[in-house]
């Protein structure tokens, strides 16, 4: 990919279950780490916003959704995250790569393929998870990647994502917020 990741700044990530929880959680985390920084949120490139409402008879495959997520993430890295880090700022990326891995695992995609797709994305210095309340009504498809995929696949995927993130926590790969 050719993305040069700076050594300056502080890079944090949060993977969340409910899209509406994204910005408040990211702002709280940012305040605990820095007075100067920003938040990079899902669908900055508008890929998913543009896809929502398209009238097509075929639903995109799980691989297509992962590739689109990776493309959006690459856009965010190139145009939002890396420039802020180069300026010495703290950046909270929400969601980040574990959401892509979680969706791939839930959809039964090979781990090796997922690792190859996301190899361009560096690990965050600190990774967090935020499990929402799955008793809450599923948000609109434009509120988050999990909501978009759940709507596209006609299945509420939040419980499966929560299980995936809890397993990451048990293995020390992220911490709960």
Regions found by a protein language model. Name each.
Residues 12-14, 42, 92, 126-132, ...:
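Hydrophobic/aromatic beta-strand patches that form the interior of the parallel beta-sheet core
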Residues 7-8, 86-88, 124-125:
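Short loop/turn elements that form and flank the Walker-type P-loop nucleotide-binding site
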Residues 32, 82-84, 120, 167:
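Alpha-helical scaffold elements within enzyme catalytic domains, especially in hydrolases
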Residues 36-113:
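ATP-dependent small-molecule kinase phosphotransfer cores
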Residues 1-8, 12-15, 21-32, 136-177:
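NTP-dependent small-molecule kinase module
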Residues 98-160:
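A glycine- and Lys/Arg-enriched "phosphate-lid" helix/loop adjacent to the NTP-binding pocket
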Residues 75-79, 124-132, 165-167:
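Low-complexity, flexible helical/coil segments
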Residues 1, 77-79, 115-119:
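A generic local structural motif
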